[in-house]
Every structure is written in C-alpha cells, then in structure tokens.
C-alpha cells in the first residue's frame, strides 16, 4: 500500500506508463498523486486523461495551469495552439466526458495523517492552511458549476498579486488561481511576482522562490508541487518536494514514493529543451 507522487506529465503517456511499471504501481492497493498539468506539449494528452480517469479512487490530482487552459480552449475562450498538441483530445468522441471530469478536480490536496499537501505551483506564504483550503474551494465550486466558462474567461491576468481577505469576485478568484497554478517567485512580504522565470540563482533581488519564504503551511506540512521544471527537482528546503523535472522538454518524469522517500525517474522520449512556457498568460 504505497503512495506515489508524480510530477507534471504534460501528455507524456508512454513515459507515465513506463514509470508506473517501473515502480510496480498496483491500483488495487496503491495510490497515485499527480501534480497537475496532465496535458499539453507531449503527444499523448488524450491517452493520459483516459488512463488517469480510469484509475478512479486510486488517483488523486490537482489542476495545473495547462489543465485550466485546456478547459478554456474547449469552452471556446482561448485559442488551440499547435505546440500544445491538444487537437486529438479536443476532437475525441469522449472529450466532453473527459473535460467535465477534469474540471471537477481540486486545486489542493491535504492528507492530515501524512502531513502532506500537494498543489501544482505550491502554497503562497501569505496563507495559513485554513485560508488555502477555503480559497481552493472557492475556485473549485466555480469550476464545477455551469458558470465555469465565465470564470475561465476572467482568470487570465497577473493582477491582483497581493493577497487580502478583502479581495472579492473575479479578482479574488484570479489571485487564487495564480497562487495555486502559476506562482514561482514572491517578494519578501509574500506578494507574487508573475514575471520572472529565471533559475533561483539568477533571480533579480529581492525576489525569492515561494518556498524560501517561511509561511505557516510549510512550517507544519510537507508540500509537493510541480510547475517549475527548471528547478530540476533541486534546491528546495527539507519537506518541500519539487517533482516537475521537465519530461515534456526532454528531461525526466519523476516519482517519489512517499513511505520511504525513494525517487524513481523515467527518461523522456524527447530531446532536451528546458525552455518553459506558461499556458495562462503565455
């Protein structure tokens, strides 16, 4: 009965299956956690969604920015970019079923027994756990409702970039979405910087990676996240697990077995190209 945490799949279906075979994943007894961005860039987004959905209660996942962008494309709000390689998924006979399932997935996973949290980009140091849970539920409720296209149309944007309990309406939902799915750097006060994608050693002052700023959640829980492939899984404090190692860019697909903290990797079938792109506000 193992728990396997896997980083951003990005349509790399063959590598996902090979990695699960490597760790001898057994859906009847094991649990799979996925950091989001199941789709885009790799060639197998349709197969990834079909497979992950078929796992039922054996899988837990969080939504990433590319997953949200896919939903916006399907809703006719955003443009389908050839580089995302989403056309087979969008034209599939079961696309409606798959994407209605996808939009009902959470932004945040919390396991109190394991003291483990997963979010695609991480947890802003401005939030305590109760706030993070409430904020996740706010966006999840809208995504699960019939008005979800209205939200998807309004989610694009970098502002507001500073949390306040007084935020309301679409501004509040946009901040929450950015914090959970796009965040990399923060100012020392926790305010989000939505522009820098440099590696931490090259980040302009006074920016710091979100995980380098102490916050109430990171002090009490382990946090697993994806999104930031250029970290290559390195440079995070104890208890912070960066799992996106750029499989779709030619890197690796990484798995962490939670019980003994052992890592497993599956090399990408693609050539190395660690340039990163944003789906939201590309």
From Swiss-Prot:
Question: Which terms are listed as keywords in the entry?
Answer: Hydrolase
A single GO molecular-function term is: bis(5'-nucleosyl)-tetraphosphatase (symmetrical) activity
Record bears the keyword Coiled coil = no
One Pfam family named in its UniProt record = Metallophos
- UniProt EC number: 3.6.1.41
- Domain of life of the source: Bacteria
Question: Which reaction is this enzyme known to catalyze?
Answer: P(1),P(4)-bis(5'-adenosyl) tetraphosphate + H2O = 2 ADP + 2 H(+)
**PANTHER family, per database record:** CYTOCHROME C5, PTHR40942
**Function recorded in the entry:** Hydrolyzes diadenosine 5',5'''-P1,P4-tetraphosphate to yield ADP.
| Record family assignment | Belongs to the Ap4A hydrolase family.
NCBIfam families according to UniProt:
apaH, PRK00166.1
Q: What is this protein called?
A: Bis(5'-nucleosyl)-tetraphosphatase, symmetrical
Which organism is the protein's source? Salmonella paratyphi C (strain RKS4594)
């Amino acid at each position: 009965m193992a728990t396997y945490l896997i980083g951003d799949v990005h349509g790399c279906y063959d590598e996902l299956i090979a990695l699960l075979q490597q760790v001898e994943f057994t859906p009847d007894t094991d649990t799979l956690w996925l950091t989001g961005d199941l789709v885009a860039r790799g060639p197998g987004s349709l197969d990834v969604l079909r497979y992950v959905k078929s796992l039922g209660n054996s899988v837990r996942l969080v939504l990433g920015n590319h997953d949200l962008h896919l939903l916006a494309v399907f809703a006719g709000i955003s443009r389908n970019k050839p580089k995302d390689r989403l056309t087979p998924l969008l034209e599939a006979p079961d696309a409606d079923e798959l994407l209605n399932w996808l939009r009902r997935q959470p932004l945040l996973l919390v396991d109190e027994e394991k003291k483990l949290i997963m979010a695609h980009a991480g947890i802003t140091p401005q939030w305590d756990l109760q706030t993070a849970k409430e904020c996740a539920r706010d966006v999840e409720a809208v995504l699960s409702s019939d008005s979800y296209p209205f939200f998807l149309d309004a989610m694009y944007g970098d502002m507001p970039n500073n949390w306040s309990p007084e935020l309301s309406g679409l501004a509040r939902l946009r901040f929450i979405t950015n914090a959970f799915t796009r965040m990399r750097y923060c100012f020392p006060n926790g305010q989000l910087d939505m522009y820098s994608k440099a590696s931490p050693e090259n980040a302009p002052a006074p920016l710091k990676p979100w995980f380098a700023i102490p916050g109430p959640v990171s002090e009490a829980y382990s946090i697993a996240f994806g999104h930031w492939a250029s970290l290559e899984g390195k440079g995070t404090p104890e208890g912070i697990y960066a799992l996106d190692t750029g499989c779709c860019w030619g890197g690796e697909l990484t798995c962490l077995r939670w019980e003994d903290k052992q890592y497993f990797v599956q090399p990408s079938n693609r050539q190395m190209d660690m340039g990163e792109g944003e789906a939201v506000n590309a």
